[in-house]
Amino acid sequence: MDVLYFAWVRERIGVAKEQVSTDACTVADLVKELSAREERYQVAFQDMAVVKVAIDQVLVSLDTPLGSAKEVAFFPPMTGG
């Protein structure tokens, strides 16, 4: 699946997009798996209360199953006006 990172999440991880093969069942499992890779992922995901997640462009929670997701995106909350 494609994993996308936006704004300061991208800056901390150092890439905007990567292809990831995973056995993770949920978003939380994917975060744990990525965080185990390198410290830069740990830094980006250290406070998941301030990171939003979307699967195939639909906002989801950490306990959401990945299922057959083609894309998972991580980004900070945004405001508009």
Where are these regions (language model features)?
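Ubiquitin-like/PB1-type beta-grasp interaction modules and other compact soluble beta-rich domains
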Residues: 1-80
